[in-house]
């Protein structure tokens, strides 16, 4: 606090005043001397009065600078009156006591303005004709301090709280001040946390719940404790008990000073962002999180971490666990989510290999070269030895036993990218699982075309067993009915046109009588589609539920489904396939971020928009009849045989990654015109055995002109083990999908 120079208020009196203070019973001075002293005091009083306005201006200026209330001029006058009465009570002659901004002889005093100062020094100067004497009166001024409250002191100290993202053990968290003044309601805190998390990580929705680190639900601001950490949950997610960012700085070391916000923002930006959020491309931060040290001095430095974005891509590596031979062989999927830094990769490896000695401290390639930086995991080597604190025998430990070599070769066989010669006839596409009705040209259709509109509608509906009067009135009055564009086991689809705008839509009529016992699938389809809003997912315009039928007005795509397009062109170029897999991957990423699995991804359920030359411009995912929300492992056996994942057939429980398997089958078909797993005469048992084995080929001549990049992507999407299979985000992160195929020469050799 700066020091303010406060001019002293001098009290001038004659020598008689001084003598009266020292000896109240002393004799009275001569009259002439008294008159002279009174004249001097009167002159001082006049000068002080003239400068009173300047004193008030100085006080007002000081009040504005300190931003705190000060005593008014009237209050100061009262104090001077008290002083005057105190001293004049002992005077026998008339004495004038004046208040001044400075003594006549130029004396002044300095008063500290700090909050700890509890005394105010007042200097009283008494002048006489022969000399002067100073009387200093010191009095405590606690009452003045009470009249000058510190407006900067908050009424309640804000709590220092750290929040994590539920289930995300790599997110460093965000620390914010929390108080009742800052957040008037719990919902306001939810809104602020949603905004902060969306800036740094991808979340499936708004923050709805807060848990403490033990999983107890927090229901009010009063339950939050200062210095503690909490977990934010979105869309009513259950609490996930994981080790939340063990390498982050302890909360006790964080401060809420003016530098705390830039620190938290910088730390939060270290975590890599997904390249696709709700179908829109977003940038990734070039920085990586420097996690907790491994104990052996991990060589991750700032200059290397800046290259993380360029080196990290989805990749499956093989791990050999240290121990007694033959050693255990495991696999691990590395991607931007679990590999933002070298230390994070070591943590991921530790959780997979589970060493007896604890944490993985050292990693070596198959040739015995030490892995010392993040980029080493994403180069040509894909097999690594994992060690803890035990000593390493370089002469023996890096030699593979026959059993170990066999296990590695089996793994590599499922990742095969080399072409083999196809023996026998070319495999064929499976039969389409639904019927498509082409336009009829017979005489009956011609008569129907020339009939009135209602008659044509009746003709179309009668062929499907639906009466025109059964159509909901709002659909019948708003749209005109067109041709049948497809049907399935439980539904039929018409092309309809809006009467006013002329825009085309699709009307899906679901027959409830054919869905006895499966009505929940219909309800789930409508419930899921109402939640969706993505450029590569068919939009639901209107739904009408009646006793016998469910009517869905859907977005219309002019090019038809992908199955028909494959039938016409047999195979697509890599550039066209890349467009379609990007759009499909974006749609799956959006679905999976909301915890929704489609369960029936196949060419028949993918609609395409074509240009005048037949090139695919856009792909949209449709038909959510089997879609559902995933809260735990699913066990229901469903889907289409050609595209079903092995975990569904094995009935061991499945989740979101069955959609990735189906997308891998589709990408394979796009490039060569037939699926990787086939059986003679489409027999299901041999087909299922082939799918469970996970072994397939890239046979020549159908794959001879197709690059290794897309083969690598397919191999990672068709992993039998869902734990190492690519996620939908990994599909989008793969260099072939991005279009950066220059990487493949050095980093994707098998």
UniProtKB/Swiss-Prot annotation:
Catalytic activity: L-seryl-[protein] + ATP = O-phospho-L-seryl-[protein] + ADP + H(+); L-threonyl-[protein] + ATP = O-phospho-L-threonyl-[protein] + ADP + H(+)
Segments crossing the lipid bilayer: none
Cross-referenced InterPro entries: Doublecortin_dom, Doublecortin_dom_sf, Kinase-like_dom_sf, Prot_kinase_dom, Protein_kinase_ATP_BS, Ser/Thr_kinase_AS
EC number: 2.7.11.1
Residue span, Doublecortin domain: 159-245, 315-398
Classification via Pfam families: DCX, Pkinase
Family: Belongs to the protein kinase superfamily. CAMK Ser/Thr protein kinase family. CaMK subfamily.
Name under which the protein is recorded: Serine/threonine-protein kinase GE16371
């Amino acid at each position: 606090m700066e020091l303010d120079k406060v001019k002293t208020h001098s009290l001038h009196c004659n020598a008689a005043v001084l003598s009266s203070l020292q000896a109240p019973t002393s004799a009275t001075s001569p009259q002439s001397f008294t008159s002279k002293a009174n004249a001097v005091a009167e002159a001082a009083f006049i000068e002080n009065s003239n400068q009173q306005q300047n004193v008030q201006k100085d006080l007002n200026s000081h009040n504005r600078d300190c931003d705190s209330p000060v005593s008014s001029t009237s209050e100061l006058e009262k104090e001077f009156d008290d002083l005057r009465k105190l001293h004049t009570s002992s005077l026998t002659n008339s004495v004038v006591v004046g208040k001044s901004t400075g003594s006549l002889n130029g004396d002044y005093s300095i008063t500290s303005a700090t909050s700890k100062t509890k005394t105010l020094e007042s200097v009283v100067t008494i002048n006489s004709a022969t000399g002067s004497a100073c009387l200093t009166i010191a009095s405590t001024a606690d009452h003045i301090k009470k009249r000058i409250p510190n407006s900067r002191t908050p009424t309640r100290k804000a709590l220092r709280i750290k929040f994590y993202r539920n289930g995300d053990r790599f997110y460093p968290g965000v620390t914010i001040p929390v108080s009742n003044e800052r957040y008037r309601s719990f919902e306001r805190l939810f809104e602020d946390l949603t905004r902060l998390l969306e800036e740094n990580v991808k979340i499936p929705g708004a923050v709805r719940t807060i848990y403490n680190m033990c999983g107890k639900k927090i229901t009010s601001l009063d339950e939050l404790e200062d210095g503690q950490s909490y977990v934010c949950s979105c869309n009513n997610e259950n609490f996930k008990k994981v080790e939340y960012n063990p390498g982050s700085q302890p909360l006790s070391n964080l401060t809420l000073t003016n530098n705390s916000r830039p620190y938290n923002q910088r730390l939060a930006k270290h975590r890599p962002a997904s390249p696709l959020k709700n179908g829109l491309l977003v940038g990734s931060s070039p920085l990586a999180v420097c996690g907790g040290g491994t104990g052996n001095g991990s060589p991750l430095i700032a200059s290397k971490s800046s290259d993380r974005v360029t080196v990290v891509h989805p990749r499956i590596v093989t791990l050999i666990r240290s121990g007694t031979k033959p050693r255990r062989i495991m696999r691990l999927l590395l991607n931007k989510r679990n590999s933002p830094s070298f230390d994070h990769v070591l943590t991921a490896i530790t959780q997979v290999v589970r060493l007896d000695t604890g944490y993985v401290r050292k990693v070596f390639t198959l040739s015995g070269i030490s892995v010392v930086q993040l980029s080493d995991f994403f180069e040509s080597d894909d097999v690594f030895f994992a060690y803890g604190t035990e000593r390493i025998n370089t002469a023996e430990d890096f030699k593979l036993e026959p059993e170990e070599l066999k296990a590695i070769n089996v793994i590599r066989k499922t990742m095969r990218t080399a072409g083999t010669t196809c023996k026998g006839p070319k495999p064929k596409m499976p039969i389409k699982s639904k019927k498509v009705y082409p336009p009829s040209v017979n005489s009956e259709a011609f008569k129907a075309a020339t009939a009135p509109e209602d008659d044509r509608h009746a003709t179309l509906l009668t062929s499907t067993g639906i009466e025109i009067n059964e159509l909901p009135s709002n659909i019948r009055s708003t749209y005109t009915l067109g041709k049948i564009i497809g049907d399935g086991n439980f539904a039929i689809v018409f092309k309809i046109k809006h009467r006013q705008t002329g825009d085309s839509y699709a009307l899906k009529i679901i027959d409830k009588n054919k869905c006895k016992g499966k009505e929940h699938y219909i309800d789930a389809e409508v419930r899921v589609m109402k939640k969706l809003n993505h450029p590569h997912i068919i939009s639901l315009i209107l739904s009408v539920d009646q006793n016998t039928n469910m009517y869905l007005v859907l977005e219309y795509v002019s090019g038809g489904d992908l199955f028909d397009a494959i039938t016409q062109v047999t195979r697509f170029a890599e550039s066209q396939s890349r467009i379609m897999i990007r759009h499909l991957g974006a749609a799956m990423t959006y679905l999976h971020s909301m915890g929704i699995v489609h369960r029936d991804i196949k060419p028949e359920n993918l609609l395409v928009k074509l240009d005048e030359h037949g090139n695919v411009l856009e792909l949209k995912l449709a038909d959510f009849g089997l879609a559902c929300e995933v809260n735990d492992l699913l066990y229901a056996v469903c889907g289409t045989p050609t595209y079903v994942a092995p975990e569904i057939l094995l009935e061991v429980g499945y989740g979101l990654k069955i959609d990735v398997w189906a997308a891998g089958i589709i990408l394979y078909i796009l490039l060569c015109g037939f699926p990787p797993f086939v059986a003679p005469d489409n027999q299901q048992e041999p087909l299922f055995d082939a799918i469970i084995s996970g072994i397939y080929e890239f046979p020549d001549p159908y794959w001879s002109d197709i690059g290794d990049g897309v083969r690598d992507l397919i191999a990672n999407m068709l992993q039998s083990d869902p734990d190492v299979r690519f996620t939908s985000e990994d599909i989008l992160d793969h260099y072939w999908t991005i279009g950066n195929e220059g990487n493949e020469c050095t980093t994707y050799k098998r």
